[in-house]
Amino acid sequence: MLYVPPGGSPRRLLLMLHGAGGTGRRSLRLVMAAADAASCAVLAPDSRGPTWDAVPGRFGPDVRFIESALAGVLPEGAGASPLAVAGFSDGATYALALGRANGQFFSHILAFSPGFLIPTHPTGSPGIFVSHGRSDQVLPIETCSRVLVPELRHDGYQVRYREFDGRHEVPLAVAREAMDWFADSLGQPESPRLQ
């Protein structure tokens, strides 16, 4: 599903990945208001299975589907630089893996309540935004973001980390903060060829 904000040509593109058992349409609702404010188009695909294929252990058909969806969108002018991959819950875990493995293509990663870091062969150095609710009972902050953010920083990534009073969710204020951080950046992505 492709969402283009009203009132003109979007200046950037966000690939938004849903949580386990979710849909692209539901994940789009998490960031739509923030995308409107930032003049950002959002591509929100559905995973090929109940969750993204790298979460069980390795990349598979979801990567090829995402690559095809991006190739179909970018030539039509909906995408602009920079390009970010984002996700919520399992989608955030997948976004961190996909974005780090394709850092030459994705300039930014936005991870809302990720679970863990999937081992990958990183390329490039995308900026990373991570948010997590202190009362998250689905993916507890103590064993998730408070562990993976220091690991990302140790690996040399610039990480903006935002804890908030809340549960397993993406509050509008957090979505806007993440989108503003992304919107303030410049850069040219390369052609869409994912690892």
Question: Language model features by range: what are they?
Answer:
Residues 1-4, 10-78:
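Serine-hydrolase catalytic machinery in alpha/beta-hydrolase-like enzymes
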Residues 12, 126-127:
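Alpha/beta-hydrolase fold active-site loops
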Residues 18-20, 74, 78, 88, ...:
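Cell-envelope and extracellular/periplasmic
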Residues 25, 57-64, 100, 139-142, ...:
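Soluble non-cytosolic domains of exported or imported proteins
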Residues 25-32, 69, 112-121, 142, ...:
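Alpha-helical scaffolding within the catalytic cores
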Residues 81-125:
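Primarily recognizes the serine-hydrolase "nucleophile elbow" in alpha/beta-hydrolase
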Residues 129-131, 137-138, 142-195:
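C-terminal catalytic histidine-bearing segment of alpha/beta-hydrolase fold enzymes
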